[in-house]
Amino acid sequence: MLPSTSVNSPAQGNGVLSSRDAARHTAGAKRYKYLRRLFRFRQMDFEFAAWQMLYLFTSPQRVYRNFHYRKQTKDQWARDDPAFLVLLSIWLCVSTIGFGFVLDMGFFETIKLLLWVVFIDCVGVGLLISTLMWFISNKYLVKRQSRDYDVEWGYAFDVHLNAFYPLLVILHFIQLFFINHVILTDTFIGYLVGNTLWLVAVGYYIYVTFLGYSALPFLKNTVILLYPFAPLILLYGLSLALGWNFTHTLCSFYKYRVK
């Protein structure tokens, strides 16, 4: 799960890495270690994961500075502790149940919504975006003099999780308090509040994603990851002019999916 690994690794001793060292640095070994820890809650540092979640809102740069520290101490950028993923999953489940309650869904409808949000919105879309960003960053953003390094898929997925968490809290938690009495009232104030929350949430996703890739010293021109802000702001302005309520569309889609 290393985001940067040297293709031409320095030799050790007689010029060949020991089998133990080679295994330790393979993506497969790291993936196995990560998945094994996923079922050992006592080995997870939930306090540190909660700290990261807090700073993703207040100072996301500090989160990625910790990624630098991990690279220096453990020779990997990506998380080796699944505590963040576990807490994110809990947030996702609780907020989705709240969404079902606010939309007056029944028990089985809420379960269907939960399965859809977890396996499609989070896992499916997350795998797609992570793979796309992994391909783009390796294909176009690696510096010419750093061709021996590449962005590993595991780090791309970590960046997605970092960016997804603020979006989740804004759209699946904070927004719940405004849906029935403000956002879905078919008034200008309604879609102004709703669409502004979408603007902030998606904007946060773009910004945290940019910070994640700009933290890698072997990448160049990462500022292009901020370019989606332009169409986002344009879409926001058009939605207000046309009276298009993003949250109303989302709620209608959710209700359609659980029928």
From Swiss-Prot:
Coiled coil: none
Biased composition regions of type Polar residues, renumbered to the chain: 1-17
Signal sequence, renumbered to the chain: none
Region (Disordered), start-end ranges: 1-22
Cytoplasmic topological intervals: 1-82, 137-163, 209-222
Modified residues (N-acetylmethionine): 1
Disulfide bridges in this chain: none
Domain of life: Eukaryota
GO MF annotations, alphabetized: RNA binding
Function: Involved in the cell surface expression of neuronal nicotinic receptors. Binds RNA.
Protein name: Protein unc-50 homolog
Organism: Bos taurus
Lineage of the organism: Eukaryota, Metazoa, Chordata, Craniata, Vertebrata
